[in-house]
């Protein structure tokens, strides 16, 4: 954006699984940089990881039981860093009912919070639930078509306008 290669009206971000953490934090810290973002099967409530099926991440991310590690987990926790009265970019947040790594309530909880605080005139927060696991299923191509159709729609690609 600074070098004029693009603008915020043409920029989208996608974060999958743990990649949803940096993308989610970028959206929270610099919402004005993005028109849209996709957070796909992402762990969005890191303070609660150890109380889920994803508790194997304790050696990687830390534990909320240690005060220093708690502070790091809080700093990267999407849900707890969502601010009131902010115009966030349009978001598509996905979760899978049978995800063996990310419990379905994590993306759902974050989507509900984004919907609660979003003040954008054209802001869209969608929560899409599938029934496969963390790595998708045989309908993965359809899922990706849905995901990219959302992003192109939000980026005002004329081929993806609603009719």
Predicted regions and their residues:
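Active-site-proximal cap/loop segments of hydrolase catalytic domains
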Residues: 1-163
């Amino acid at each position: 954006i600074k070098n004029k290669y693009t603008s915020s009206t043409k920029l989208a971000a996608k974060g999958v699984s743990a990649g949803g953490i940096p993308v989610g934090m970028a959206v929270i810290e610099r919402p004005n940089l993005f028109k849209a973002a996709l957070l796909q099967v992402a762990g969005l409530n890191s303070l609660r990881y150890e109380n889920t099926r994803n508790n194997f991440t304790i050696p990687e991310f830390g534990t909320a039981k240690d005060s220093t590690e708690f502070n790091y987990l809080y700093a990267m926790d999407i849900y707890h860093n969502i601010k009131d009265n902010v115009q966030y970019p349009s978001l598509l947040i996905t979760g899978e009912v049978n995800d063996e790594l990310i419990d379905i309530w994590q993306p759902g909880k974050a989507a509900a919070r984004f919907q609660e605080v979003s003040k954008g005139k054209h802001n869209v927060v969608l929560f899409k639930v599938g029934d496969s696991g963390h790595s998708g299923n045989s309908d993965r191509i359809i899922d990706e078509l849905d995901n990219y159709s959302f992003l192109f729609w939000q980026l005002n690609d004329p081929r993806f306008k609603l009719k």
